[in-house]
């Protein structure tokens, strides 16, 4: 039986080995690239796959139609997911005749969702387990195939329980996989009335509330002990982490948070005292409790507290859906540079935002807007400004997957707009320069230019009309129901983290990334229809500054406005862009590590994009609205943008890859 496996972490390694031991053929393994901001104490699925000689992939979005097609070509009989962190689309789940099955780290239907290992310890459970279940659209809700119970000892912490669960998972898989291979797959529906759901835990969730019962505080210490981020508190402004503790029943009448003694170090809780066995001050080393007290300058009677508040004024909460994308990650950086903004974000990956994951004002959840509607509705209600940035926005996908473009770019975003109407929240919506289509004006005016697209049999326009229709719906909600909105139209923004060379390899990237990939790989630069199409290229820093000013909305001047954000002075044809890029490439200090230039190749657009494609000769913005509403003017020259973008991509190429 041929299997395709989605796996990560120690549990992923156990699953892969168990599937092999049961005699399955593994056609491919899909995993994740390690996050540099995460403590990767666990085994590497990619390394295991490489050692076993099994093809392994780590796409940013495995649910992308390109990857769905590739998985379909593998023709799996069965699909397994072992601690893979992303939900799989229904298209993938339906590819295997025998079904798709996930290993979950709890006794379902209890503890559905994220981090069940930590949550069972937080809640003081005495038993947990692992469950193999059939995968359906809703996470962790499918029929149960098999489960294995695991007792939780009073001295178990996150790491010891993790090891127990891995061992139980291996026993479970060794028992059930041979049976499944013979076609005998048990199926027991979950009792929805017994289901509980828990969300992702963040490092800041380790903050101790000394007014809680001592058992609650002790369980928190157990749940997030190393290698997890740890339970922590403050002595004044100094943070310290507690790595191990024990319960003492007598608080001697002390107030919660009071230091009862320093040797041993004991702190009063609501109904007892916590003895701190080991801990760590700031970024220092782990020491015993009495030494920690000495380091912190604690004395009996001192009161521990929460971190000091920075300001009495509530910060502005900004919800960014698609926060890991090009605009989303740069906008997050700009907002976090201002003290009065708090960012909440969702996306299907976190590679571009890994540098923010530990930031105290950045709150990220990995998820899909087409699945996590309850989370989105809750955060629309909670936040002040909403930016729905999720969209398929690469031309080749318009002809490859027009229905998927419509479903995501229009239908899913319309639901978010309706939440904004329902809760009366301000929305800053990304329209697109593509809505102008084949407009013949010398420069495109937001309030006067006609929006002209081609015939219905040219699916290339599905993105343009999806965005245009949403623009019109948003405008109508503003007129009829008082929705506060601003529409912004980016004109060919460029810069670091635009997309990836891997995306370019499958044709799903912006023009400059495709050009850079050709230089990196020593293949001819393809000029579609000769590359005579003109665009106005805008530096991401200029674009983000304009977008930031829209969010600030000084004097409410952006309400109900459509604003082009582009640089009319940076107009160039694609051929001119390629020539400028080649010149910068030849001068780059890493040039010697890459193959010789392979020349230019003129390609017909039909052969490259498909028969449903049409192009436009020029696309230049009028930026009068931006000047008037934002006091904004772009300032960065195109050459500077090209050089910085090129440098980012060249330095992202692995040294071994350069040499090959």
UniProtKB/Swiss-Prot annotation:
Keyword Oxidoreductase: yes
Alphabetical keyword list: Antibiotic resistance, Lipid A biosynthesis, Lipid biosynthesis, Lipid metabolism, Lipopolysaccharide biosynthesis, Multifunctional enzyme, NAD, Oxidoreductase, Transferase
Residues under site feature: Raises pKa of active site His: 140
Residues where (6R)-10-formyltetrahydrofolate binds: 114, 136-140
GO BP field: lipid A biosynthetic process; lipopolysaccharide biosynthetic process; response to antibiotic
SUBUNIT field: Homohexamer, formed by a dimer of trimers.
Protein name: Bifunctional polymyxin resistance protein ArnA
Species assigned in the record: Salmonella gallinarum (strain 287/91 / NCTC 13346)
Top-level taxonomy: Bacteria, Pseudomonadati, Pseudomonadota, Gammaproteobacteria, Enterobacterales
Gene: arnA
């Amino acid at each position: 039986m041929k299997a395709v496996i989605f796996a990560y972490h120690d549990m992923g390694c156990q699953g892969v080995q168990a599937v092999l031991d049961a005699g399955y053929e593994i056609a491919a393994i899909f995993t994740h690239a390690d996050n540099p901001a995460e403590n990767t104490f666990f085994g590497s699925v990619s390394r295991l796959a490489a050692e076993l000689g099994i093809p392994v992939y780590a796409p940013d979005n495995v649910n992308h139609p390109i990857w769905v097609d590739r998985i379909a070509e593998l023709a799996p009989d069965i699909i397994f997911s072992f601690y893979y962190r992303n939900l799989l689309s229904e298209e993938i789940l339906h590819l295997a005749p025998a079904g798709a099955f996930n290993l979950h780290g709890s006794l379902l239907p209890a503890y559905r969702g994220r981090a069940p290992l930590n949550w069972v310890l937080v809640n003081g459970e005495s038993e947990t387990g692992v469950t193999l279940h059939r995968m359906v659209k809703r996470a962790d809700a499918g029929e149960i195939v098999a489960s294995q119970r695991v007792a939780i000892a009073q001295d178990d912490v996150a790491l010891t329980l993790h090891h127990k669960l891995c061992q139980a998972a291996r026993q479970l898989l060794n028992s059930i996989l041979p049976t499944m291979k013979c076609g005998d797959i048990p199926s027991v529906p979950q009792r929805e009335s017994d289901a509980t759901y828990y969300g992702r835990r963040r490092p800041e969730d380790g903050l101790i509330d000394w007014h809680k019962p001592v058992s609650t505080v002790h369980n928190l210490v157990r749940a997030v002990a190393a290698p997890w981020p740890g339970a922590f508190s403050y002595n004044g402004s100094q943070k310290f982490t507690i790595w191990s503790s024990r319960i003492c029943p007598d608080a001697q009448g002390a107030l919660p948070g009071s230091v009862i003694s320093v040797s041993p170090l004991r702190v009063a809780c609501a109904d007892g005292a916590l003895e701190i066995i080991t801990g760590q001050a700031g970024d220092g080393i782990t020491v015993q409790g009495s030494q920690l007290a000495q380091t912190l300058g604690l004395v009996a009677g001192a009161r521990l507290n929460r971190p000091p508040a920075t300001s009495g004024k509530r910060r502005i909460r900004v919800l960014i859906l698609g926060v890991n994308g090009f605009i989303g990650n740069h906008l997050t950086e700009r907002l976090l540079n201002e003290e009065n903004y708090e960012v909440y974000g969702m996306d299907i990956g976190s590679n571009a935002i890994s540098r923010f994951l530990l930031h105290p004002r950045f709150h990220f959840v990995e998820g899909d807007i087409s699945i996590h509607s309850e989370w989105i509705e809750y955060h629309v209600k909670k936040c002040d400004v909403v930016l729905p940035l999720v969209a398929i926005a690469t031309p080749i996908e318009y002809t490859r997957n027009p229905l998927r473009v419509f479903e995501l770019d229009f239908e899913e975003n319309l639901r978010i707009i309706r939440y904004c109407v329902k809760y009366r929240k301000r929305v800053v919506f990304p329209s697109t320069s593509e809505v102008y289509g084949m407009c013949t004006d010398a420069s495109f005016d937001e309030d006067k230019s006609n929006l002209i697209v081609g015939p219905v049999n040219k699916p290339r326009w599905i993105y343009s009309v999806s965005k245009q229709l949403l623009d019109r719906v948003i405008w109508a909600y503003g007129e009829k129901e008082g929705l506060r909105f601003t529409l912004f139209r980016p004109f060919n923004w460029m810069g670091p983290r635009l997309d990836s060379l891997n995306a370019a390899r499958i044709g799903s990237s912006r023009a400059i990334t495709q050009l850079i990939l050709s230089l990196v790989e020593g293949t001819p630069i393809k000029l579609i229809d000769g590359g005579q199409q003109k665009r106005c290229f805008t530096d991401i820093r200029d674009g983000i500054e304009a977008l930031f000013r829209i969010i600030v909305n000084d004097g409410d001047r952006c309400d109900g406005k459509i604003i082009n954000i582009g640089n009319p002075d940076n107009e160039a044809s694609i051929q001119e862009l390629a020539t400028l890029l080649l010149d910068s490439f030849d001068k780059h200090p890493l040039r010697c590590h890459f193959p010789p230039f392979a020349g230019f190749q003129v390609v017909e657009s039909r052969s490259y994009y498909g028969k449903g494609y049409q192009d436009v000769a020029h696309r230049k913005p009028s930026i009068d609205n931006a000047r008037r509403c934002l006091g904004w003017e772009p300032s960065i020259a195109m050459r500077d943008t090209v050089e910085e973008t090129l440098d980012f991509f060249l330095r992202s190429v692995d040294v071994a890859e350069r040499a090959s």
